[in-house]
Structures are given as structure tokens and as C-alpha cells.
């Protein structure tokens, strides 16, 4: 049975892990849930990796990650290239920074030793190669020294990254923002769903990986707008080609992500329009990055628009969970038995 296509995940990232005991020990992985994955690496929850299982190197910390991957397959492709920059075909031979000087018993090139500088330099390289340069990715740094090392490399290399590539820092130590965990038994690094903030239990940071949205909540208003437009057939005409959109004809249609704008257009029209509006006219490119809506003139990002579109056409269950109205729990009624018990205790 052929698996049904899924919507673009709320979050899927490739992360860099560092031992807090020995900073030279590093690990690269991918996950849709960084807090849970960090708990696994630290042995708090089952499911870590062999290379991070040594207690002498624990605890580990996530010092940086790249988010915005459209699927687990896309993230794994990037992870493999970052782990094996000496053999990855995504890196042109003339641009390669990592080289193997030894071979394994099977004759394959042996992976060169990793260092923070080598990982960051190859990360910078991968973000600029044709395979990944136009993906809707975002780079996050959670440690000042790692971000400083990134800055030093960017300052010395000639190859520049795409100007619209977001690089975000969230060090958090100075903010001191914390939230109460649901219970003391919930392990550090596992963010509970539906925390009510009543207090009690241990505290979990709200910065760094714990501040990343793990669900579609940031898109709730956008998704609701798209559902409303198509449910009540308010598509109107394409914002680009001006052709009337027939609800019966099918096809894929993207919606402007800006609040208050209901601009809808054919997917191919949006793509051509955004590519053409780029500097140089998007010459040779297939995948748009972003631009401005032809109706409201507000900024739009292709990755965000595609996430809403895939939710609308492939993610019925996810949309229902996102838009359902949460009922407030009714106050518990006092029973006669409870009253009698309290009187006996008092």
C-alpha cells in the first residue's frame, strides 16, 4: 500500500550536539522534537544514540540547529551531507573543505575528525550550495561561543549566504525565563503538552530549544483563513493572472499569509511571479524563496505558504486538532461523601 503524502511538518531540524564535559566531543543528528531528543541523548528517556551513550560525556547540550526542513527525508539528506562533507555529492569538488586521508577496511574513505570549526564551516558551505541554498531554512544558535565561531568563519570566507536566510540567536541565560513543569516526575528536556502554569514541580527554560514551536500553533490564524476561503468558495480570481478560480476545477492554490489579505492564486502563477520579482529574475531557479503579495504588497515566504497549502490538502487531522475549540473543564462538584470525609478529617 502506497503511503499517503503528509503535510510539511511543524518542525524538523538538524542539530549540533556538544558534550558539556568535553567540548571537543560533538554529534550531529535530526529530529522533529529537540527537547525530547536531548533527553534521549542524556539518558533521561530511552532512545538515544550509541555515540552519546557514554556517561562520562554527559550531559550533552544542543548548541545550534537548522530548522525548516519540509520532511524527515529532507532533514536526513542535509544531516548526512553535514556528517560526511568529505564524500557528499551535494558539495562540488572544487568547493570541498573536508578531505579523507585514510580508508576503511572496505576501501571507503574514512570520515575525517570533527571539530566545531569544521562543522560550522561545512554548515556554511552546505547552506550556499545549489542543493540547499533556496530551501526555507533557518539557522539557530543557543551558545554565545558557537555563534562567535560562526561569525569569525563568515568574516573570513568569500562565499556569501542568501541575504534572506534567517540566523537567529537565543542564548537565554540573561533572560531567566522559566515555566513550571507539570510534575516533578517529568524529565528535564521533555516539554509537557498543555502545561497550565499552575506552579509546582521543577522548572523548564523557555529559551533555546525549549522555546521552539513543536506544533502548528503559530499558523493557526493563517490556516483558519485558508479553510474559510475555500469552504465558502471565496477564492475569486488569481492575484497574478487574474483568471477566475473555479472551485470545481481542482488544482493547487496558495493563499497570501498576511493578516487581512485573502489573495489566492494558482500555485504555478505564484511561483513564476515570486521568481520573477527576485533580483536577477530568479534565473535558473525553480524554487521561489519569497517576495511580496501582488494584492496587499506584504512580504510572503514560500515555505510558510507551502506549509499552509499542504495542511489544507493533506492534513485534515492536523487541521482539525489545530482549529478545534478547547472546552474549559467544568469545576468539580462537591459530593456529600467528600463533605463528610472533610468533616471527619477536620
From Swiss-Prot:
Record's compositionally biased regions (Basic residues): 324-336
Task: State the Gene Ontology BP annotations.
Answer: double-strand break repair via homologous recombination
ZnF SLX1-type: positions: 238-296
Q: Where is this region: Disordered?
A: 324-346
* Limits of the GIY-YIG domain: 10-92
Source taxon at top rank: Eukaryota
GO cellular-component term (any): Slx1-Slx4 complex
Q: Which cofactor does it need?
A: a divalent metal cation
Pfam families registered for this protein in UniProt: GIY-YIG, SLX1_C
> Could you tell me the EC number(s) of this protein?
3.1.-.-
Which is one GO molecular function term here?
zinc ion binding
Extent of Basic and acidic residues compositional bias: 337-346
Question: Which keywords describe this protein according to UniProt?
Answer: DNA damage, DNA recombination, DNA repair, Endonuclease, Hydrolase, Metal-binding, Nuclease, Nucleus, Zinc, Zinc-finger
List the Gene3D superfamilies hit by this protein, alphabetically: GIY-YIG endonuclease (3.40.1440.10), Zinc/RING finger domain, C3HC4 (zinc finger) (3.30.40.10)
The answer to whether keyword tRNA-binding applies is no
Which subcellular locations apply to this protein?
A: Nucleus
Query: What CDD domains would the database entry show?
Result: GIY-YIG_SLX1 (cd10455)
- InterPro entries (alphabetical): GIY-YIG_endonuc (IPR000305), GIY-YIG_endonuc_sf (IPR035901), Slx1 (IPR027520), SLX1_C (IPR048749), SLX1_endonuclease (IPR050381), Znf_RING/FYVE/PHD (IPR013083)
Principal localisation: nucleus
Summary of the function given for this chain in its UniProt record: Catalytic subunit of the SLX1-SLX4 structure-specific endonuclease that resolves DNA secondary structures generated during DNA repair and recombination. Has endonuclease activity towards branched DNA substrates, introducing single-strand cuts in duplex DNA close to junctions with ss-DNA.
Q: Hey, which family's this protein in?
A: Belongs to the SLX1 family.
On assembly, the entry states: Forms a heterodimer with SLX4.
Q: What is this protein called?
A: Structure-specific endonuclease subunit SLX1
Organism of this sequence: Podospora anserina (strain S / ATCC MYA-4624 / DSM 980 / FGSC 10383)
Gene, per the UniProt record: SLX1
Amino acid at each position: 500500500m502506497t503511503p499517503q503524502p503528509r503535510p510539511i511538518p511543524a518542525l524538523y531540524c538538524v542539530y549540533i550536539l556538544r558534550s558539556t564535559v568535553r567540548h571537543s566531543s560533538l554529534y550531529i543528528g535530526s529530529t522533529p522534537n529537540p527537547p525530547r531528543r536531548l533527553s534521549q541523548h542524556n539518558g533521561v528517556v530511552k532512545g538515544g544514540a550509541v555515540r552519546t551513550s557514554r556517561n562520562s560525556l554527559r550531559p550533552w547540550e544542543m548548541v545550534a540547529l537548522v530548522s525548516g526542513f519540509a520532511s524527515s527525508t529532507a532533514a536526513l539528506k542535509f544531516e548526512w551531507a553535514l556528517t560526511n562533507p568529505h564524500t557528499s555529492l551535494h558539495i562540488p569538488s572544487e568547493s570541498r573543505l573536508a578531505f579523507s586521508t585514510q580508508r576503511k577496511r572496505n576501501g571507503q574513505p574514512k570520515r575525517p575528525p570533527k571539530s566545531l570549526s569544521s562543522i560550522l564551516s561545512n554548515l556554511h558551505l552546505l547552506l550556499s550550495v545549489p542543493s540547499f541554498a533556496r530551501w526555507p531554512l533557518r539557522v539557530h544558535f543557543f551558545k554565545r561561543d558557537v555563534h562567535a565561531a560562526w561569525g569569525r568563519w563568515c568574516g573570513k570566507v568569500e562565499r556569501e549566504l542568501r541575504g534572506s536566510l534567517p540566523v537567529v540567536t537565543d542564548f537565554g541565560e540573561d533572560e531567566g525565563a522559566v515555566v513550571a513543569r507539570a510534575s516533578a516526575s517529568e524529565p528535564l528536556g521533555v516539554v509537557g503538552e498543555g502545561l497550565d502554569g499552575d506552579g509546582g514541580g521543577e522548572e523548564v527554560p523557555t529559551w533555546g530549544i525549549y522555546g521552539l514551536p513543536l506544533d502548528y500553533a503559530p499558523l493557526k490564524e493563517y490556516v483558519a483563513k485558508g479553510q474559510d476561503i475555500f469552504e465558502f468558495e471565496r477564492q475569486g480570481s488569481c492575484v497574478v493572472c487574474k483568471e477566475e478560480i473555479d472551485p470545481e476545477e481542482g488544482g493547487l492554490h496558495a493563499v497570501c499569509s498576511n493578516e487581512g489579505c485573502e489573495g489566492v492564486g494558482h500555485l504555478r502563477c505564484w511561483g513564476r511571479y515570486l521568481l520573477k520579482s527576485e533580483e536577477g529574475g530568479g534565473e535558473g531557479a525553480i524554487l521561489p524563496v519569497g517576495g511580496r503579495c501582488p494584492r496587499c504588497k506584504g512580504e510572503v515566504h514560500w515555505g510558510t505558504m507551502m506549509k499552509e497549502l499542504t495542511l489544507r490538502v493533506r492534513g485534515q487531522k492536523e487541521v482539525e486538532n489545530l482549529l478545534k475549540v478547547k472546552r474549559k473543564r467544568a469545576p468539580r462538584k462537591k459530593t456529600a461523601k467528600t463533605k463528610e470525609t472533610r468533616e471527619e478529617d477536620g
